[in-house]
């Protein structure tokens, strides 16, 4: 999202608007896959801004057009078949791959940033529950309510650590409340 923010925002935000419009025309319920990056403020990167705007679009379609929408904010999902590399890899997947490859665990910044890690099975259970209700643009957080520092997580994996520069726009803390 940092490399080409205009293209990214156009794709993500307009894509969400089109899905909302399709839900309106088909009189369907919409469960929006949000992100913990939209929680709190300020929006520190294009991804977070697009996810927050998506939630706002869903709420507007509920209030103006009567579409049943609900947004689910995912908090650092991990579990089976998680990506271990590329732009969608999470720190758990990256650490898993680095451990299997006997590589040092790369930690951005000082490692004291904190994350609420949520297993994919809990996300699925939350989405199923949300899909069964009627909503008016509400936002629900799908997380554990407990967070750990990246250093704590690295300690669970064990092994050598390598600290690299912090990434721009990275939130200091995520925690579902």
Regions found by a protein language model. Give the residues of each.
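Glycine/proline-rich active-site loop of Rossmann-fold NAD(P)-dependent oxidoreductases
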Residues: 52, 77-93, 101-108, 112, ...
